[in-house]
Amino acid sequence: MRILLSNDDGVHAPGIQTLAKALREFADVQVVAPDRNRSGASNSLTLESSLRTFTFENGDIAVQMGTPTDCVYLGVNALMRPRPDIVVSGINAGPNLGDDVIYSGTVAAAMEGRHLGFPALAVSLDGHKHYDTAAAVTCSILRALCKEPLRTGRILNINVPDLPLDQIKGIRVTRCGTRHPADKVIPQQDPRGNTLYWIGPPGGKCDAGPGTDFAAVDEGYVSITPLHVDLTAHSAQDVVSDWLNSVGVGTQW
């Protein structure tokens, strides 16, 4: 199995290095990751400037100023030959649950892999300690995929409780929960008296009930949420069409 491995925490982050070491025991792994932390970069792609890469002695490749999406795009289309069989993103330092997937560079890297035609996993740890647990879970899933491919055409967003492996209760297939809207902005002043702003933390849990990714992780289970790229709200199409007809928009300008 040939694996393109990326992340959004940066090429030297403990999550990606722990996972790379574990994956290399049974797979051909090429790390292509940002040279620095790009958390929250979502699906951003660098279009107005060039990208420079640096290859380390162990073969890992850092993309200078690159986003997670840049890294996967370059990895698939230029840097990994032959091309990968699958794209894996992670292990992220912290969860990507509920609405987090909108902003997550970890999920975005997997999404880019799927967009380019490859199976893809995004892996996150609900903390900053037991990366070995998340690596073991990921390796188990990848070995299973190698034996029997999962042909859903979906991204698997995997969130692992920050627990020792022997305390993980199992795996649940889940849906995304939701958070309350975030509203924290932290102002500061620089030495010249100019105001700076820091984006605050994400909102608290809103829908974290049974069946959600939040609930699974809170209860000690690995959460696997299938995600797809099509953002169309199919159930709303008729509602929007009826509204347009009722208000007359489009019949005259």
From Swiss-Prot:
Record keyword Glycoprotein present: no
Xref: SUPFAM superfamilies: SurE-like (SSF64167)
InterPro entries named in the record: SurE, SurE-like_Pase/nucleotidase, SurE-like_sf
One GO cellular component term noted in the UniProt record for this chain: cytoplasm
Gene3D superfamilies: Survival protein SurE-like phosphatase/nucleotidase
Top-tier EC class: hydrolase
GO molecular function: 3'-nucleotidase activity; 5'-nucleotidase activity; exopolyphosphatase activity; metal ion binding; nucleotide binding
Official protein name in the record: 5'/3'-nucleotidase SurE
